[in-house]
Amino acid sequence: MGEMIKVGMADMNVCKPPDSITTLGLGSCVGIVLYDPGKKVSGMVHVMLPDSTKIKNNENIAKFADTGIDELVRRLLVLGATRSSLVAKIAGGAQMFAFSSNNDMLRVGERNVEATKEKLNSLRIPILAQDTGLNYGRTIEFNPESSELLIKSVGKPQKKI
């Protein structure tokens, strides 16, 4: 049993077995797990916003889907991952508050999921599984040994994807 490496909000980290990696409290944020199943190298980024180019205070690259995913790929390659072997699992992107509006700025969760999928597609990293949207938060734990992403939500049964 290894260490559980924590990833905070607008943060990222990488790990190898026997360690696992987790992030807590994904609401509209998206937790993105990238891993190389052959080398069992994995990483996670907890993104808050879809696009760094639309924000002035954008120094924290882990905060954004566009820059966070790029940096996570870089860190995984340094750890020994093979670029063409990387695959993804994603969770989060909930609509945490009920409202009736067509204002695109209020659809943060949906926009985060869209930006994540677009970025992964542009990098040719397939998404093997996802648990996104709806109206509840999630905590996720990834085990690089089994490639399972455990998803916990209040009042919901745990699931593995």
UniProtKB/Swiss-Prot annotation:
One Pfam assignment: CheD
Domain of life the protein comes from: Bacteria
Regions that span the bilayer: none
Molecular-function GO terms, alphabetical: protein-glutamine glutaminase activity
Reaction(s) the record says it catalyses: L-glutaminyl-[protein] + H2O = L-glutamyl-[protein] + NH4(+)
Biological processes, Gene Ontology terms: chemotaxis
UniProt-listed SUPFAM superfamilies: CNF1/YfiH-like putative cysteine hydrolases
Enzyme Commission number: 3.5.1.44
Gene3D superfamilies: 3.30.1330.200
Keywords: Chemotaxis, Hydrolase
EC class of the enzyme, as a word: hydrolase
Similarity-based family: Belongs to the CheD family.
Function according to Swiss-Prot or TrEMBL: Probably deamidates glutamine residues to glutamate on methyl-accepting chemotaxis receptors (MCPs), playing an important role in chemotaxis.
Protein's name in the database: Probable chemoreceptor glutamine deamidase CheD
Native source organism of the sequence: Lachnoclostridium phytofermentans (strain ATCC 700394 / DSM 18823 / ISDg)
Source organism phylogeny: Bacteria, Bacillati, Bacillota, Clostridia, Lachnospirales
Name of the gene: cheD
